[in-house]
Amino acid sequence: MYHDLIRSELNEAADTLAKFINDDANIDAIQRAAVLLADSFKAGGKVISCGNGGSHCDAMHFAEELTGRYRENRPGYPAIAISDVSHLSCVSNDFGYEYVFSRYVEAVGREGDVLLGISTSGNSGNIIKAIEAARAKGMKVITLTGKDGGKMAGSADVEIRVPHFGYADRIQEIHIKAIHILIQLIEKEMVKA
């Protein structure tokens, strides 16, 4: 009944992944991001992650697998997803939604920490404001974006960009894979002397 649609969706996902894999810049960006994060952890820093909608879920998933576990048991790593509902609703109400992440970064971000901002379009105003707040704190910035990087293009120390111009779900599929690889590489870096 839906076999053709299912195959079409899976083929499009596979094609998007293949294009991402075949661009060496993407592989290099993931490696640089993992080393940047591990270096921050080794120096006593933390990562603060944020996103909207599905990207918000990815930011939470990233933090959870760093503080909890990925595949193997190991010490937890310092990671916070900006997801506290009371903070989000307070700042949205009192300042506006575009400040929900930047206010948090202003409050808890420190020099040596890393901000991970996730936006499939690269145009999320509240992520852009969080990047500005992170820069003001002396933090490093990693972004996961899509399409042409949007307004966030060029704003990060490391940008992992999925150059897909269709629906956001294809970009999110690559983002979650990149997140899992980041965690795997961070774990390898953390056991180095």
UniProtKB/Swiss-Prot annotation:
Cofactor: Zn(2+)
Residues engaged in binding substrate: 52-54, 65, 93-94, 119-121, 124, 172
InterPro entries linked to this entry: GmhA/DiaA (IPR035461), Phosphoheptose_Isoase (IPR004515), SIS_dom (IPR001347), SIS_dom_sf (IPR046348), SIS_GmhA/DiaA_subfam (IPR050099)
GO cellular component, one term: cytoplasm
Known pathway: Carbohydrate biosynthesis; D-glycero-D-manno-heptose 7-phosphate biosynthesis; D-glycero-alpha-D-manno-heptose 7-phosphate and D-glycero-beta-D-manno-heptose 7-phosphate from sedoheptulose 7-phosphate: step 1/1
Catalytic reaction equation(s): 2 D-sedoheptulose 7-phosphate = D-glycero-alpha-D-manno-heptose 7-phosphate + D-glycero-beta-D-manno-heptose 7-phosphate
Domain of life of the native organism: Bacteria
GO MF terms held by the record: carbohydrate derivative binding; D-sedoheptulose 7-phosphate isomerase activity; zinc ion binding
Subunit structure of this chain's protein: Homotetramer.
Protein name stated in the entry: Phosphoheptose isomerase
